[in-house]
Amino acid sequence: MQTTQRASSFAAAEDNIAMDKAVVYTRIPHLYLWLEILNILSSRPLTGYAQHTSLPEVVIPLRVTGNRPMWAMGWLTYSLHFGGQKHFIHIKAKKFLVSRLFSVFTYTKQGALHKDQPYVQNDCYYHGHMDGDPESMVAITTCYGGFQGILQINGTVYEIKPKNLSSTFEHLVHKMDSEETELLPMRCALTEEIARQMKLQQNENPTLMQSHYEGWWTHKSFLDLALVVERERIRYHNNNTSRVLVEVFTIINIINNIYETLDVELVLLGVEMWNERNHVQVRSIEELLDEFCMWKARSLNFRIPNDIAHIFVNHEFGIYLGLAYIGSVCVPSHNCGVDRLLGGNLFYFGRIIAHEMGHNLGMEHDSSSCTCGTKICLMAPADNGIPKFSNCSYSYYWATYATAKCMRKEKKSKGILRGKLCGDGVVDDGEQCDCGSAKSCADDPCCKPSCTLKDGAACAFGLCCLYCQIMPAGTVCRQEVNECDLPEWCNGHSHKCPNDVYLLDGSPCRDGGYCYEKRCNNRDEQCKQIFGKEARSADHSCYRELNTQGDRFGNCGVIRDAYLRCHDPDILCGRVQCENVAHIPFLRDHSTVHWTHLNGVTCWGTDYHFGMTIPDIGIVKDGTDCGPEHVCINKKCVSKSIWRSQCSPKTCNMKGVCNNLHHCHCNLGWDPPHCLKSGLGGSIDSGPPNYTENYTEKKHKKSIGLVILFWILFACFSVLFIVFLFFLRSYVELPMSEEPKVPTPENKEDTNEVMNTETE
């Protein structure tokens, strides 16, 4: 292969440039058209015409439920019985496999470039593994009904797909053809000579010499991917571009599964299909790589920004499977590769493409000293069935990652990865609502699939929308969450709650702290959050000793590849140091707890190293005090005067507080903007409160309470009265002594006798 770029020798190259300028941008009239087309594919296996070595087994995937922690993290478990035993698969949805701004480029018969932005379901691709076998692989999709995809167990690959016309969720499991899944004579086209030439060519390119980044601790990285599918591969799918897309999505899901061990996430930004003719000639694989890279640099890069771009070709290259530039990721002129796709074994294709992308990421072919638990790994020169990276591949990757700036970017799930599409579940400009999929819209009482409100509906979403109607003014739509926050109320006209406002930065809060960005900042409280309720901020000697070291355990920030030592005035603004720690806390992955004995004090802290994507819990928070009238801002101890504001309790007539927009938030009984007149309180930013309604409600509740209390007392008195009557009746009915009878004429004599007797 030539070491310098040469002009294209392919026909119509000049026409391509002119044609690329005439892009026809279109939108699909009905967004669910793509879904209906793709659903047709459920009758055809995703692996195309792949051969199988045995008759299929019928299985019924059964969902397994229970109290396992992994389910709380989005993992699902299913049991499948095949191969004479029961298997449990753990799967998790792969979010953002396809960009929300995903574009498909095709060509008209006249040669005009046609752009579509179809709705693509993005939560139905799953990756995972078999229970008890961390080396296994599961890559399936549920987008088209049931499970369709690949299961790899102990080096054996199975295809799973739904059984047609089954009413009991039956699936078919096939064992893939062994001649495609075991060691083959096919190999990567990268030879030692070509590798040397590529290195020489790249070393001469100054764009490859990016900033050195010693000490980088690698974690999550993101790669924007663009793909091109040449004419013959589209013909293989009977010119059905929807089938091509399904194949592409499934392959990317498999590759993402392979690269998960490196914590690399691929996001597909776009696909270009050469459905009319190829725009470069397909001859030898070396020439194709050169010409594709040149075409990409002058054409594709302007349509689909990418970190890596590959072309899928349905063409024989002898024994060669693919070719890619080494260490070329992030370099627009060389970050490309060629992949040969013949037949329909998508797992086989996934290994090929993952191998060639490995070259883009700096990985060379494995030598005899490289290992991945077996002697043959993914980056072996000849293809094999083991999609695992070796220790050598890891080393090459780390070296490339240290200089590959495009990989060290924040995830683009927000922002440019989202296009304006009705039906994607996100309300864009010009849409009254967006209920998402057809099923979701069928269940939505307020929104139509056309992203307009249903008859009688005034709203479909928002904190001030209830049962498709706007809530009345004065309804609380956002309660305060802490002492540094302020409430908001609906205004009666909008379905949206007013913007969140909170106390002005610098407002005092508990334990001598200050409010800053809606939180009360205090080092003692920060230590409690990390190490438990008994912990507290350590002695100043801990801060002085550790934060002046300038390492990952004590520093005042990072510039490029170096930790900054804290100067003495700023030691309280570096990393928080704690004491009185009773137990080591449970922290997220990649977190480190350290302790140091210093002059009879044990100083506790956490580290935060390069490449971590989780929040840093151990850095002293901005707004924390660092001395009299001083606070920490950007790891510097600065005067509290930076919070000087025209708003103060005095400007609020001492009847309110200042919010973060420097406006008065008045107490109950005073009216904004300056709390000078009687009113309901609140601010010009919070919406109108309805304290009267709240007072009436409280009064009503109080009245109800008094009524209840009255009836309770009445019942008690009634019981006491009944008891009193019972005892009174018992007393009246007690037996009493007989009284002397009054003598009558008939018994007069007898009476006298008795009386005489008694007197005697």
Swiss-Prot record:
Residues noted as binding Zn(2+) in the record, renumbered to the chain:
188, 355, 359, 365
Q: Which residues form the Peptidase M12B domain?
A: 221-413
Pfam families from the UniProt entry: ADAM_CR (PF08516), Disintegrin (PF00200), Pep_M12B_propep (PF01562), Reprolysin (PF01421)
Q: What class of enzyme is it?
A: hydrolase
Composition-biased stretches, type Basic and acidic residues, lie in 738-751
Q: Which residues form the propeptide?
A: 51-213
Chain span(s) of sequence motif Cysteine switch: 186-193
Q: Where is the signal peptide?
A: 1-50
Residue spans, topological domain Extracellular: 214-706
- Gene Ontology BP, a term: cell differentiation
Q: How is the cofactor bound?
A: Binds 1 zinc ion per subunit.
The entry's protein name is Disintegrin and metalloproteinase domain-containing protein 25
Localization in the cell:
Membrane
Question: Catalytic positions?
Answer: 356
Q: In what residue span(s) does the Disintegrin domain sit?
A: 419-505
- Give the intrachain disulfide bonds: 336-406, 370-392, 372-377, 477-497, 647-658, 652-664, 666-675
The organism's superkingdom is given as Eukaryota
| Function recorded in the entry | Sperm surface membrane protein that may be involved in spermatogenesis and fertilization.
What Enzyme Commission number(s) does the record list for this chain? 3.4.24.-
What are its GO cellular component terms?
A: membrane
Names of the cofactor(s): Zn(2+)
SUPFAM superfamilies registered for this protein in UniProt:
Blood coagulation inhibitor (disintegrin) (SSF57552), Metalloproteases ('zincins'), catalytic domain (SSF55486)
Please state every residue range assigned to the domain named EGF-like: 660-676
PANTHER family named in the record: ADAM A DISINTEGRIN AND METALLOPROTEASE DOMAIN, DISINTEGRIN AND METALLOPROTEINASE DOMAIN-CONTAINING PROTEIN 20
Give TM regions: 707-727
Report membrane topology.
Single-pass type I membrane protein
